[in-house]
């Protein structure tokens, strides 16, 4: 058995799970998520828990087993708690602001970069140097945060740019090197 796949997923109170063939719908206090899973995976609801089983011990079935269980667990966590990614903007004159459903980034280009807020995602800008991306779909939140970061990735020498709040940057040394001038 897959170490991850064999663990049952507890269904918290207030969450409704519906299985229709290979389509799983999870409804909770924060919203509803629907995902199509691999047709070979067997998903059952027993004793207020979701169980994921695989048809055989073949290598790809083992991989799909853990993946399917994790995707369903992420859906349950998303509709109960939600997900958020925090980005920080580092650099003189670099800032973010929100206008309606648009995020406007001034990050050293000759023009401000405008990014539209997609459906299912909310953007908060608590101050000019922080962006908080929130949503119920873990993959969508992560992808959107990565797209914002891609606008101006952190510079490897100075660290200027957009980075995740928990990201640790290893800065390179300049041309002078360790010894400096001789």
Curated annotation (Swiss-Prot):
InterPro entries: Ribosomal_uL6-like, Ribosomal_uL6-like_a/b-dom_sf, Ribosomal_uL6_a/b-dom, Ribosomal_uL6_bac-type. Transmembrane segments: none annotated. It comes from the Bacteria. GO terms for cellular component: cytosolic large ribosomal subunit. Gene3D superfamilies: Ribosomal protein L6, alpha-beta domain (3.90.930.12). GO terms for biological process: cytoplasmic translation. One of its GO terms (molecular function) is rRNA binding. Coiled coil: none annotated. Keywords: Ribonucleoprotein, Ribosomal protein, RNA-binding, rRNA-binding. Belongs to the universal ribosomal protein uL6 family. NCBIfam families: L6_bact. Part of the 50S ribosomal subunit. HAMAP family: Ribosomal_uL6_B. PANTHER family: 60S/50S RIBOSOMAL PROTEIN L6/L9, LARGE RIBOSOMAL SUBUNIT PROTEIN UL6M. This protein binds to the 23S rRNA, and is important in its secondary structure. It is located near the subunit interface in the base of the L7/L12 stalk, and near the tRNA binding site of the peptidyltransferase center. This is Large ribosomal subunit protein uL6. It comes from Caldicellulosiruptor saccharolyticus (strain ATCC 43494 / DSM 8903 / Tp8T 6331). The gene is rplF.
């Amino acid at each position: 058995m897959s170490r991850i796949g064999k663990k049952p997923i507890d269904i918290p109170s207030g969450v409704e799970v519906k299985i229709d063939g290979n389509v799983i719908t999870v409804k909770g206090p924060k919203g509803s998520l629907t995902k199509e899973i691999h047709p070979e995976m067997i998903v059952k609801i027993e004793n207020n828990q979701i169980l994921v089983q695989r048809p055989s011990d073949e290598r790809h079935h083992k991989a799909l087993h853990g993946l399917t269980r994790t995707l369903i667990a992420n859906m349950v966590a998303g509709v109960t708690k939600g997900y958020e990614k925090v980005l920080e903007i580092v650099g003189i004159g670099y800032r973010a602001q929100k206008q309606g459903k648009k995020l406007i980034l001034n990050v050293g280009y000759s023009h401000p970069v405008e990014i539209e807020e997609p459906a299912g995602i909310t953007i908060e800008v608590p101050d000019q140097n922080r962006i908080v991306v929130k949503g119920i779909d873990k993959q969508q939140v992560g992808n959107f945060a990565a797209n914002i970061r891609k606008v101006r990735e952190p510079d490897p020498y100075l660290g200027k740019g957009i980075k995740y709040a928990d990201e640790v940057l290893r800065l390179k040394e300049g041309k002078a090197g360790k010894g400096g001038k001789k």
